[in-house]
Amino acid sequence: MDFSSNHGTHRPKVLIVLHQEHSSPGRVGQELVKRGFALDIRKPRFGDSLPDTMRGHAGSVIFGGPMSANDPDGFVHKEIDWIKVPLQEEAPFLGICLGAQMMVKQLGGTVSGHRDELVEIGYYPLKPTEAGKDLMDWPKKVYQWHREGFDLPSGADLLATSPTYPNQAIRVGPAAYGIQFHPELTHQMMVKWTTKGAPRMELPGAQQRRDHFAGRFVYDTAVRAWLDRFLDLWIGTAEAPVQHNRLKAAE
């Protein structure tokens, strides 16, 4: 799917923040478009601005990237600071991998590598907490590509965990979520990542390239189903968006 021409002016927009020149929102973007949303793709790393308010957008997603949330680059600090906009307005926000780590930094938490320098690159187990189980069913394994993780910041609910990096999915307030794994991954993206990122598969804890594709064959159906359930919970559709403030008032 070509997202570059997706500028529907009469459809609710979801802000998409990417970090590389040729990055794609992948399956997440595809599913949002199927739900009737237009994608407003911005890349602050290359000079794009971010909105002062979320009133013009139905939600926002900050995706991953090869950089660290601890990097000194101006765009990294800009994005971390900007996340307070959807958090304060309680607008739907999703951080994926780096995006989740940026949200944690905004909340005063820390991002760091594993004490034994282990990475997660490939498919790894995921276990929902009781809070996570109350929300939805979760896949048993998910696709990962990271060498840093985040702690649990004050005010965040832990939804899912794993043995190597214990904080895998969190919720902050009624509408903000951060996930360490990559449900957006398409087959084409896996080919690209495992080709360009081949040296990273030599890092401790990483899986070999063939295991990535074997894992996708086994686990991707469950990940796809999870993403559909998550989007139902998080944003809904353009015609029937989730009213998080109403849900909060009913709790």
Where on the chain are the PLM-derived regions?
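C-terminal helical/coil "lid" or tail adjacent to the Rossmann-like core of SAM-dependent
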Residues: P174-A176, Q180, E184-H212
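Short glycine-/acidic-enriched loop or helix-start segments at secondary-structure transitions
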Residues: P25-R27, P51, D71-D73, V104-Q106, ...
